[in-house]
Design a protein with these regions (language model features):
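Donor/substrate-binding cores of folate-linked one-carbon enzymes
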Residues: 15, 81-184
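N-terminal glycine-rich "phosphate-gripper" loop used for MgATP/nucleotide binding
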Residues: 30-31, 54-55, 59-63, 73-89
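Short beta->alpha connector loops at strand-helix junctions that form conserved
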Residues: 49-54, 102
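N-terminal Rossmann-like dinucleotide-binding module
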Residues: 1-36
Length: 186
């Protein structure tokens, strides 16, 4: 699932292609038609479904559509690789312990929107990224993996975001590779 540029999605696809991650992407779901993630998936020959959040106003209804789609595809694990929507209990319960998110902070610090801006505002010297299991409480699920990124003198939002994203591209495939033996047991 993705909403934006799709760089984390493509990092997963590349990890699969190189054999770093033994998995298969059954489809990408985007909620922002024409976004970079959709373009990347189409270029890679990966099926894409578009569930435009502007046309489905009710978040629970959107999440219900996601669950139906994933079950029809017999999806075992759902990865939110830049999904910029808060999910409801419908999706969380439908994929309990099998819904994974990557967040641009060292959780539990800087949960929610604009974690990078929050870190800069707080003046921390280290931030990073976290892969975690999604629960009903925003960015509060069990942590699977983290990577630290120093905040350098003169960092602005764009520079820090770029360095965090570089770590996300490494961390997400690694965390999924470590998790894979356990996800079929749930």
């Amino acid at each position: 699932m993705a909403s934006g540029s799709g760089s984390n999605f493509e990092a997963l696809a590349q990890a699969i292609q190189t054999g770093t991650l033994n998995a298969r992407i059954q489809r990408l779901v985007v909620n922002n038609p024409g976004c970079g993630a959709q373009q990347r998936a189409e270029r890679l020959g990966i099926p894409v479904s578009v569930l435009d959040h502007r046309l489905i106003k009710n978040r629970r209804e959107l999440d219900g559509e996601l669950v139906r789609l994933f079950r029809a595809d017999q999806v075992e694990l759902v990865v939110m690789a830049g999904w910029m929507r808060i999910v409801t209990d419908v999706l969380v319960s439908g994929y309990s312990d099998r819904l994974i998110n990557i967040h641009p902070s060292l959780l539990p610090s800087f949960r929610g929107l604009d974690a990078i801006g929050q870190a800069l505002e707080a003046g921390v010297k280290v931030t990073g990224c976290t892969v975690h299991i999604v629960t009903e409480e925003l960015d509060a699920g069990p942590i699977l993996a983290q990577a630290a990124v120093p905040v350098l003198d003169g960092d602005d939002h764009a520079r820090l975001a770029k360095r965090i994203q570089e770590q996300e591209h490494l961390l997400l495939p690694r965390a999924l590779a470590e998790l894979k033996p356990t996800w079929r047991q749930g």
